[in-house]
From Swiss-Prot:
It holds the Pfam family Lipase_GDSL. This is GDSL esterase/lipase At2g31540. It comes from Arabidopsis thaliana. InterPro entries: GDSL (IPR001087), GDSL_lipolytic_enzyme (IPR050592), SGNH_hydro_sf (IPR036514), SGNH_plant_lipase-like (IPR035669). Its main location: secreted. GO terms for molecular function: hydrolase activity, acting on ester bonds. The keyword Hydrolase applies. Glycans are attached at N104, N326.
Length: 360
């Protein structure tokens, strides 16, 4: 056999053998959804509060974002990625989700999805009165502007196809309870029992996701409450004890709310043809990390990495604040918000649940 024929045959065999591998690789890297859309509060706000808003709830300054690839703060309330970024990466949509208010969004940014969330927001409009954040109830108006721009890029039919098949994340609630019930009792006269206020918030949540559905959304992940009694700032405000135990009665409130939410979502899904709703449990994973920290590589779960870790968040966590060196060993980055390491654990748990629900 001539040398040229031998080379040709070798290349043919190699190409044939590698073809299935390439096909498998393409299958695994193909996005499960065409776009990802984010609504809610600081747990998922990727930088909307950077832009002209009269709010102090900002994270566009060091040390926020210090573990991002460029090491620069961009509005995310963590040292690195948020849970929404991690989910988007795992679903092969994009690595980072841009905020909708970012002025230089590209067509590709619009096509693959953006974030409408605002740090300090809540389902209760009263929450944003004190924080000056973009109310959750206002975020659908931003979404309508997004839809108009999307239609301008790909046309009406393709735009609605993208929205119908997009993956949507809704994450809010903690601010409502902290600002309107626990720390500032502005809703206690109206709702003397926490269960009544929970029902009010859940009704607001239901109205919100129904509005998203009316705009074309079909695939929705809804986040529950974290263990509110274990947030460092909450322990500082409510617990004058050097041992800093979690506030169990507030954790019980979170459990009750989450149980109600888990019961509500299937009811909403059944009433909205073609919709799929998935509950995102953050409470149990975080409690597991708090109770068994070494299993996940954590050494500190009762305070944040920034400053003393007891009070600092937003403008109080700043360039003058000392920052821990071993950020992957801290459950919280500031006194409210989880570290990227925590979000990675939660993202790993959510990924198979998302695929199981939405690939079926």
């Amino acid at each position: 056999m001539s040398t040229s024929k031998a080379i040709t045959l070798t290349l043919f065999i190699a190409t044939t053998l590698l073809a299935p591998c390439n096909a498998a690789a393409n299958a695994t890297t193909k996005p499960l959804f065409p776009a990802i859309l984010i609504f809610g509060d600081s747990t998922v706000d990727t930088g909307n509060n950077n832009y002209p808003l009269p709010t102090i709830f900002r994270a566009e300054h060091f040390p926020y974002g210090m573990d991002l690839p460029d090491g620069k703060a961009n509005g995310r309330f963590s040292n690195g990625k948020l849970i929404s970024d991690i989910i988007a990466t795992k679903l092969n949509i994009k690595e980072f989700i841009p905020p909708f208010l970012q002025p230089n969004l590209s067509d590709q940014d619009i096509l693959t999805g953006v974030c409408f969330a605002s740090a300090g927001a809540g389902y209760d409009d009263l929450t944003s009165l004190s924080t000056q954040a973009i109310r959750v109830s206002e975020q659908p108006n931003m979404f309508k502007s997004y839809i108009a721009r999307l239609k301008g890029i790909v046309g009406d039919k393709k735009a609605m196809e993208i929205i119908n098949n997009a993956f949507v994340v809704v994450s809010a609630g903690p601010n409502d309870f902290i600002l309107n019930y626990y720390e500032i009792p502005s809703r206690r006269l109206e709702y003397p029992f926490i269960s009544g206020y929970q029902d009010f918030i859940l009704k607001r949540l239901e109205n919100f996701v129904r509005e998203l559905y009316s705009l074309g959304v079909r695939n929705v992940l809804v986040g529950g409450l974290p263990p509110m009694g274990c947030l460092p700032i909450h322990m500082t405000a409510k617990f004058r004890n050097i041992f800093r135990f979690c506030l169990e009665h507030h954790n019980k409130d979170s459990v009750l709310y989450n149980e109600k939410l888990q019961n509500l979502l299937p009811q909403i899904e059944a009433s909205l043809p073609g919709s799929k709703f998935l509950y995102a449990d953050v409470y149990n994973p975080m409690m597991e990390m708090i109770q068994n920290p070494s299993k996940y590589g954590f050494k500190e779960t009762k305070r944040g990495c920034c400053g003393t870790g007891f009070l600092e968040t937003s403008f109080m966590c700043n360039v003058f604040s000392p920052v821990c060196q071993n950020r992957s060993e801290f459950l919280f980055f500031d006194s409210i918000h989880p570290s990227e390491a925590t979000y990675n654990v939660i993202g790993n748990l959510l990924d198979p649940l998302i695929r199981g629900k939405f690939q079926a």
